[in-house]
């Protein structure tokens, strides 16, 4: 179980454990939302004060979920490599644990997510693992967790409007870094991913590939997973599933393949798409309004068992 609704609880648990072991005074970090919620929760449990530099455009749901834990929130208009390096210096100066979900800054914490790979091995045979990538750290963690126990190919999935690792894998750019992002997918908007090269190396070592997916395809997959599978995930998670669907349609993925998709966070983390769908502000219904709707169901074929 991930108490705050994303896999980053694993990273936070390992990060706080390292902070306590080293006798640090608290923690400081950056986040687009999920990592901040995780660190704030685990930091509160450990009694360690936290200072979170959060992206100013983070989804309100993510920000609100952090507030109850009591960490100090510092909204920032920009959180690039320069800002992260500066925060690392402050962490060292004030004896705080640096909490950034990247091996480049927090290898001890990132090790907490490597168990995802080893847990996959216990689930049975699989041939491909589709992983959403922002900074690239999760993909690296999955690769390290799999180790030599699996021959599965790793597939790096990113939004078309922010896909430096995919473009680097495709040899379109010489560094996994671009000037800016146009994607609106929260958590995947990193033009200069700190673990970009590590992630690309992990993909190449498994003979995998990169997939760029439109924001629109990610949203469609989010709706599909919720309405057909009963799984409500945030757009960043749905993007990886959309990449799989696109590879199936194009024939890139063989019919005999047994793919796995890493779904990283709950859909309750980012509800921006659904704010205009406020059913409580529409007209009220009566019991009499139910009959025509129920009759429509009665006339349809029952769903086949899956």
Question: What function would you assign to each model-found segment?
Answer:
Residues 1-306:
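PLP-dependent amino-acid enzyme catalytic core
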């Amino acid at each position: 179980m991930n108490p705050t609704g994303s896999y980053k609880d694993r990273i936070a648990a390992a990060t706080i454990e390292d902070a306590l072991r080293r006798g640090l005074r608290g923690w400081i970090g950056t986040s687009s939302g999920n990592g901040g919620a995780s660190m704030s929760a685990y930091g509160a449990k450990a009694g360690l004060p936290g200072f979170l530099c959060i992206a100013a455009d983070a989804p309100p749901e993510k920000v609100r979920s952090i507030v109850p834990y009591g960490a100090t929130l510092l909204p920032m208009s920009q959180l690039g490599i320069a800002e992260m390096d500066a925060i690392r210096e402050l962490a060292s100066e004030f004896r705080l644990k640096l909490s950034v979900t990247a091996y480049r800054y927090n290898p001890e914490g990132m090790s907490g997510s490597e168990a995802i790979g080893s847990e996959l091995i216990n689930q049975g045979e699989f041939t491909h693992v589709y992983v959403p990538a922002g900074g690239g750290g999760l993909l690296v963690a999955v690769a390290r967790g799999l180790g030599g126990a699996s021959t599965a190919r790793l597939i790096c999935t990113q939004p078309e409007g922010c896909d430096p690792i995919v473009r680097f894998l495709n040899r379109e750019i010489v560094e996994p870094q671009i000037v800016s992002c146009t994607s609106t997918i929260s958590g995947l908007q990193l033009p200069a991913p700190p673990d970009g090269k590590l992630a690309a190396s992990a993909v190449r070592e498994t003979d995998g590939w990169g997939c760029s997916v439109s924001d629109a395809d990610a949203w469609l997959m989010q709706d599909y997973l919720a309405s057909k599978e009963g799984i409500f995930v945030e757009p960043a998670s749905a993007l990886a599933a959309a990449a799989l669907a696109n590879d199936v349609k194009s024939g890139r993925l063989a019919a005999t393949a047994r793919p796995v998709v890493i779904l990283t966070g709950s859909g309750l983390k980012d509800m921006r798409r659904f704010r205009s769908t406020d059913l409580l502000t529409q007209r009220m219904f009566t019991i009499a309004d139910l009959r025509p709707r129920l009759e429509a169901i009665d006339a349809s074929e029952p769903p086949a068992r899956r």
